[in-house]
UniProtKB/Swiss-Prot annotation:
Positions annotated with a glycan in the UniProt record: N239, N295
UniProt signal peptide: 1-17
Binding positions for FAD per the UniProt entry: I106
Name of the encoding gene: rstn6
Pfam families with a match to the protein in the record: Pyr_redox_3 (PF13738)
Family: Belongs to the FAD-binding monooxygenase family.
Record's protein name: FAD-dependent monooxygenase rstn6
EC id: 1.-.-.-
GO molecular function per UniProt: monooxygenase activity
Amino acid sequence: MYDVIVIGAGWCGLVAAKTYLQVCPDARLLLVDGDSSIGGTWSKERLYPHLVAEAHHGLFEFSDLPMRRDTVLPDGRIPSAAVHDYLTEYATKFDLIDRIRLNTWIENVRREPAVIGDNEAPRWMLTVAGSCEQIPTKKIIIATGLTSEPYMPFLPGRQEFEGEVLHSKALGHPQTGDRISDPSVRHAVVYGGSKSAFDAVYLLLRAGKTVDWVIREQGGGPSMMTPLSILGQPSFRLNNSRLLALFSPHPFDTTVKASWWQRVMHRRSGRLAQLAVIGFWRILAYLLQRPWKYNQSANGRRLRPLLALDSLFWSPATLGVMTHPELWDDIHSGERVTIHRQAITALGKDKRVILDNGVELSADLVVCATGWHARHTLFKPEEQLAVGLPSAVSFDPKSQSEWINLQRKADQEIIEEMPILQKSPVPSVPFRCEDDYHLYRFIAPSREPPSHERSIAYVGFLRTAGAPIVYEAQSLWATAYLTGALDVPGPSERISEVARTNAWIRRRYICGRKVPFALFDFLPYVDMLYRDLGVNPHRKANMVAEICGLYQPRDFQGVVSEWLASRGVKDIENV
């Protein structure tokens, strides 16, 4: 039986495994992944031509292995193949390759109680899809993240449709590449308005296709795409400065008193402070949106973010970096791409795609860039709530009433403490408390049954712009939690904290009403995790650099060793 199994061999899983082994070098650890190569989102089978990472060189790496400069483009952009190669190099350096089992899709995870008369404690049992194999383990780390199970919309008539329908996740499959390069495929429809839709449209146009780009009028609208650079610096770097977080109200300050700035600008702030905050975000949004000249064409106007200059602050749709800005020339010319702000209601014979305004399009290929499932199928629906995951199954009446009351109380506290969030656009659908993630610190179930105690943790279940920095912090926190080296509050305090952070996310980020989100607040979140661990999160030499400087993964180099040293343990990697 394994001591711990990590499910997922992408960014989250690799650093979770490396960190656990650094703390517990003798542990029997296994990584499993359903793909045929490591990398998760950046596995070989998910890469396709022109795909480029949003983060620039120096930001998309872990603290203990720099990405080689000769693998990236001259302007610092990182090709997808370089990301995959980097993760392979990381797994090799830290001796993870022999512990990884690929082509192993876990169909179900269940908790088995201890057998009477057996000396073994309760264990987790993982069932491998397509076989009768079951793998036992004492502990599990779920590192599949929030982009592993594609969401495909229901499209009536799909069986009669004579073209091909696929999710953007499949764009890297060899057969998809063959299909796109086939000269008989001339017309394509892309459905969705996220960053992946922009990438799909670019790929198809460069392959010589004509594209009808369909984005629903309802929902969060198209992503607000930022330019590659702003004020002479890569725009992605903005997120890696504490300066941006200063203007974002958040609940992650765990010190006795919130900072002076937080109190003045966000905590029970007055009208002038709120105007200053909104003004800051509108000016920044203007600078980021100005290069695209939305009013230059009908296509451009249809890609205008839903809330215009307020789209950056409230984030009705996920943000993205325009890794291929030349796409805007195609968008504005309209010669080979037409944008429709409609929904697809059906597919028909003769390769027809029918929109809700009655317009019929012709398509040899339909690419659904429609995001990811918020549901997680590793656990049965009736077991999901017990492990902190959202579920279609309801809580028992007592627990449901408790969570509803906690939600209401937490929401009231959030708007009292951060009045600006009272102006958050009203959600379009009512919320079930069962739709929330109930994860303390977004890592540990808020209320574990006694048989589950400290045996399950999650890494990568918070969407941020600082992935490597966040994943490293989460991995150390999860390892400390699973090994009993971290003190955590009791269930009552944990569930109150979970209700509070969930209430904040719903108010702060519109797109966070589907999955946990902390776009501009990830550094304060990381601070909180390291404070829990007794590690200093402030890595800069002085206050000016701390506030205005760029935070990179390398700033946290050696953090695991620091934590081990604080516990009087020698790190074998540094001996």
